Amino acid sequence: MAVPKKKTSKSKRDKRRATWRHKAVVEAQKALSLGKSILTGRSTFVYPTAEEEEEES
């Protein structure tokens, strides 16, 4: 069974967690921004919306 040779330092652990959390924050901001633009109708959205799907059928 694979076992780490040495304990990871707290600073390295914290740095990795900070990177991971920052990526999550950036993705959350993008999602919120996209949601706001869709609600205001200012978006040029790539995926078809429910209204467009109904018109095509």
Curated annotation (Swiss-Prot):
Residues 1-22 are annotated as: Disordered. The keyword Ribonucleoprotein applies. It holds the Pfam family Ribosomal_L32p. One of its GO terms (biological process) is translation. Keywords: Ribonucleoprotein, Ribosomal protein. SUPFAM superfamilies: Zn-binding ribosomal proteins (SSF57829). InterPro entries: Ribosomal_bL32, Ribosomal_bL32_plant/cyanobact, Ribosomal_zn-bd. One of its GO terms (cellular component) is large ribosomal subunit. The keyword Ribonucleoprotein applies. GO terms for molecular function: structural constituent of ribosome. Belongs to the bacterial ribosomal protein bL32 family. NCBIfam families: rpmF_bact. This is Large ribosomal subunit protein bL32. The gene is rpmF.
